[in-house]
């Protein structure tokens, strides 16, 4: 078998179709920092960012409409979950009442304020939806426990008893992918800080949690697990590092093959801090983005190849088409991966 390995590698190179691995910039019509993006289809996507800004396209990004949520110019929308060209959630992150959750059902003309963080010391980090009605929201620890909220109707959110946090442990609001869901009930989220670098896992809609350690660096409040994604029920990738050291490859990636019970670092790390990772089911590829560049893997995250040097914060894919967003209103499309 060992002697056949070069043959298998050659076959992989021959049968795998050529893939145009690149981001093509688009015009966002805004200059604010963008942190969230959510693709609905090949034509419909939403994005979000600072100063109460949200964006939408219905023509594949040929045109993006940028708007500000009325009365929310102070909001930093770190997360967006789009459900159609009409319906979307916006999550703002900030201390106490600066953490808010909005929803639109009319394409973004009117936004309903669903919830304001009731704790002045709280800070919301991310939101994810299992389906149009069932979702979960994650916040930094309050009184020693992570702040977990869930919904079963898409409108009313109920606070759960979150899992206990270690001292100086928290989550990150860098790309709205530090919280990840799969199937009908499973959720994972990553942590950072000097006690962080851990991944929590729930199989019952966020009611109870188990936790595991990862090899991602967590030697400062700036370092830890920033993003998690799964390709199936067992195989996942977590990325991160230290966002203050964007070119440092130490502790930037971990892989699990048992649904997050254990995590291991591959032999090849990512070349620097990465804030988001995504799996493209259509092409069986993994993509990672961060402030120092983008990378692609075709072997489950074990090895990576840089393909773009621009700095992006977040990304979202539908099939083989997706968008990435970044500082200064940066937005780009990857088409036909």
What is each residue range found by the language model?
Residues 1-4:
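Positively charged n-region of N-terminal signal peptides that target proteins for export
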Residues 6-16:
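Bacterial N-terminal signal peptides
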Residues 20-337:
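Residue-level hotspots at or immediately adjacent to binding/recognition sites across diverse folds
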């Amino acid at each position: 078998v060992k002697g056949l390995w070069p043959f298998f590698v050659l076959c992989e190179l021959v049968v795998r179709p050529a893939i145009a691995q690149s981001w093509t910039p688009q015009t966002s019509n805004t200059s604010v920092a963008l942190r969230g993006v959510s693709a609905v289809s090949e034509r419909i996507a939403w994005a979000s960012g600072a100063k109460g800004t949200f964006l939408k396209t219905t023509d594949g990004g040929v045109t993006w409409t940028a708007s500000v949520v009325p009365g929310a110019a102070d909001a930093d929308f770190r997360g967006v979950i789009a459900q159609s060209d009409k319906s979307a959630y916006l999550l703002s992150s900030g201390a106490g009442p600066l953490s808010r959750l909005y929803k639109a059902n009319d394409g973004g003309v009117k936004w309903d304020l669903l919830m304001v963080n009731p704790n002045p010391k709280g800070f919301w980090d991310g939101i994810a939806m299992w389906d149009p009605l069932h979702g979960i929201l994650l916040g930094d620890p309050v009184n020693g426990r992570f702040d977990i909220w869930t919904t079963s109707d898409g409108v009313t959110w109920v606070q759960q008893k979150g899992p206990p946090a270690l001292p100086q442990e928290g989550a990150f609001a860098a790309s709205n992918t530090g919280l990840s869901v799969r199937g009908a009930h499973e959720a994972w989220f990553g942590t950072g800080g000097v006690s962080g670098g851990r991944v929590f896992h729930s199989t019952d809609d966020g009611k109870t949690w188990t936790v595991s350690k990862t090899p991602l660096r967590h030697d400062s409040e700036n370092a830890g697990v920033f993003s998690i994604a799964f390709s199936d029920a067992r195989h996942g990738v977590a990325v991160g590092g230290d966002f203050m050291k964007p070119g440092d490859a130490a502790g930037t990636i971990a892989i699990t093959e048992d649904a997050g019970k254990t995590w291991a670092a591959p032999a090849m790390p990512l070349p620097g801090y990465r804030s988001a990772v995504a799996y493209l089911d259509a092409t069986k590829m993994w993509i990672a983005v961060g402030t120092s560049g983008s990378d692609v893997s075709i072997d489950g995250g074990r090895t990576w190849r840089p393909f773009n040097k621009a700095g992006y914060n977040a990304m979202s894919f539908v099939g083989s088409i997706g968008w990435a967003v970044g500082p200064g209103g940066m937005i780009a499309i990857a088409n036909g991966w």
